[in-house]
């Protein structure tokens, strides 16, 4: 494990332990941000912990986190942090929240780590080195028929009849099984071969930077609604190779 990945794993584990101290706490303080989403002391303290560790080890590296102002990079390296992906789940005592951290070098994400502290699961990947869950290699599933696939959607609109004719939206009517697991947890189900597709319609860089290398190194693919692999796109789709390739072909034909 290279030093950058080792540092990312250590930070994700330390931040995870910090969040567990707040998890299911009845006296948890909850605040509302300008975008009307919730944030807790655990979110802020976990991000501060990771940001401080990065500054200590790599003072010229940049840091982009969900909760605080970006610290610009002076060397082309930028760490991207989501201290608690799934804050609403965290607040309600649902153990599916994740601590996410990625390293981007010259605009390309090189590694990603996602820790699920309440589950005891740690996913990580580095470009060209495969993807792992708790130290064991993982791969996406080989299911190629969408009628046999499990598709996960985050937004409640997918349970309604008024979805668009976009190929990704149409999965709801074609899939063998549709479920509503959101946030990074759903995408890790794809990476580990337990689901075939996971869809998030609204994503920020800190929501997806860590999960993209894990899914792709597990043999899958990630792209937005335009079919582009990016951390700054229009939503995010994670899929196994077979179904992802078919989806991309359908998007290109639109």
Task: Identify the residue ranges that each predicted region occupies.
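N-terminal subdomain of lithium-sensitive/metallo-dependent phosphomonoesterases centered on the IMPase/IPPase/PAP
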Residues: 1-84, 229, 242-243, 249-252
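Residue-level signal for inorganic ion chemistry
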Residues: 19, 43, 54, 87, ...
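A structural micro-motif
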Residues: 28, 61, 129, 175-176, ...
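Acidic active-site catalytic centers that drive phospho-/nucleotidyl reactions
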Residues: 41-43, 47, 66, 82-85, ...
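DPxDG-like acidic metal-binding loop motif
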Residues: 73-132, 149
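Short loop segments at secondary-structure junctions
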Residues: 104-108, 118, 127-130, 136, ...
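An extended, acidic
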Residues: 139-254
